């Protein structure tokens, strides 16, 4: 088996809004992420909370931010995410808001890096909380074994007394050279102690 290349890890979700209580795990849906550098992460996050118009314009069913606390590639690294019921809605939503044409209050707080749409390959439950994220290169011939292994790992961790632990494996749609041949693995719990 070819070795896996870990690119970026460790993202902690600061804030999110989504109705996820007892949400089912599903491979339906898609996510968009806008990767940015924020000079003042707290101020940018607060501005997003107070001005949800960008999220509302895209038709998202849930949205939030994740801040990279370790393994970051640049200072102020964070992403703004949005959840959609399907890939089509995510792609169409991306045409309804242009982050490069954002109001000045947003532009002055962040530097855009790139955006990408993600499709889950394994059943995933949207329950924002504490997250660890890895971007991994997996050869195509090993993809099924890799996803099955992560599903078994999730079941084992849940059986060991952590029922709110979830893994998700996502494939990028777009994202340019930043996410090419990369899977995103998100391991999520309600908090770091869970």
Task: Show which residues each predicted segment covers.
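Sec-dependent signal peptide recognition
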Residues: 2-7
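Hydrophobic h-region of N-terminal signal peptides that target proteins for export
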Residues: 9-18
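Short S/T/G/P-rich N-terminal loop/turn motif that feeds into the first structured element of a domain
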Residues: 18-194
